[in-house]
Amino acid sequence: MTGSLWLSLALSLAVLAQFKVSAAPNLVCFYDSQGSQRQGLAQFSMIDIELALQFCTHLVYGYAGVNADNYEMQSINKRLDLEQRHLAQITSMKERYPHIKFLLSVGGDADTNEGNQYIKLLESGQQGHRRFIESARDLVRRYNFDGLDLALQLPRNKPRKVHGDVGSAWKSFKKFFTGDFIVDTESETHKGQVTALIKDLSAALKQNDLLLSLTVLPNVNSSWYYDAPSIAPSLDFINLGTFDFLTPQRNPEEADFSAPTYEAVGQNRLGHYNLNFQMEHWLLQRVPANKINIGIATYGRSWKMSKDSGDSGMPVVPSTQGPAPAGPQSKQEGLLNWAEICSLMPNPSNSNARGPNAPVKRVVDPTKRYGSYAFRAADENGDHGLWISYDDPDSASSKAMYARARNLGGVALFDLTQDDFRGQCTNDRFPMLRAIKYRLL
């Protein structure tokens, strides 16, 4: 074959490879196995999983944990995972869905048995790392997973504080000199330990043709813990937790957009609280765009509005009183799943309702830059005030389009069990998942 023909063939293959990347983006579906333990309309069944799988490229089972004494990876719900064989149930679907990769995730803020076992793991040296790696590989192989997702529970950034203009200026001045924003004085050492762990873990998994992904949890400072250029070659993809920048638990006194795509300027906002900043950080660290998946949440964050919060609902909303009451399905203060949020929108069943069942006012973001919100001002007694920041199918679709436009790997959905998987709102099951998939096609 002549040199020109070889060149033409090489160029054609390169074009085809690029087309393949852009034509088949990732839709990484996180599945919180605790959803199968919920009651009533919130219970997520194997039938629900099967319906969702037609839209996913990867299914990530959450979650395993780390034993704080011996650093081995272990089940954190042995009754469900092992005795009821839920791990095996999930991977048994591989035969029917051979195009999907099934991963087991460790951490993910679900491992609450010990507060700092992940830092202890990093500091445990080669022996501790080896125990974790061997146990992780054994667990993944025993239950026939295709790989491991590493969702390390590392110290979080301190939340934004509420101050007046003068107070904010003084606080910034003070922080510059005292460094009181630092939450981990050993972060540089820990970064090196994370790098070593990921490289060794990847090498061990690759011996058995297993995948390794990294999930960066919300509000974990990537620059503190992840040496991106060093770890990227060892990772098949990276899921960014680009949501929960503000939550009622972290920011009880003010409500604001929890998952904006771009920076919402003004009002003492922090420039890194948005999807675009986080994604650009990894790109600037020379991580290939097609290894980055942006995270989209299927739930919203909800604050309790007080009389002093006003009645406009426009963020930043002052004088909030922490998390709003839990929803009837999600049963978690300060969090409402998409079905619960949708049911609060004006509809025939709540048009005359008052008090906690009164409808909310929906405010759509026409720019698609910040996200939608909904609110119900507090009544004359200061009760029943509610403010919700959320992504809906429209904004999720816009974020998926963002991922396509930036030639990213795709989207990671957190998670299937908080989507409207029963179609309670519009009779359309998994509306968030579907909206993302159709935009990624």
UniProtKB/Swiss-Prot annotation:
Keywords: Developmental protein, Disulfide bond, Glycoprotein, Secreted, Signal. Primarily expressed in yolk cells and fat body. In larvae, it is expressed in small and large salivary gland cells, and weakly expressed in imaginal disks. Less expressed than Idgf2 and Idgf4. GO terms for cellular component: extracellular region. The keyword Disulfide bond applies. Residues 1-23 form the signal peptide. Residues 25-441 form the GH18 domain. Glycans are attached at N221. GO terms for molecular function: chitin binding; imaginal disc growth factor receptor binding. InterPro entries: Chitinase_II/V-like_cat, Chitinase_insertion_sf, Glyco_hydro18_cat, Glycoside_hydrolase_SF, Glycosyl_Hydrlase_18, IDGF. Glycosylated. Cooperates with insulin-like peptides to stimulate the proliferation, polarization and motility of imaginal disk cells. May act by stabilizing the binding of insulin-like peptides to its receptor through a simultaneous interaction with both molecules to form a multiprotein signaling complex. Belongs to the glycosyl hydrolase 18 family. IDGF subfamily. This is Chitinase-like protein Idgf3. It comes from Drosophila melanogaster (Fruit fly).
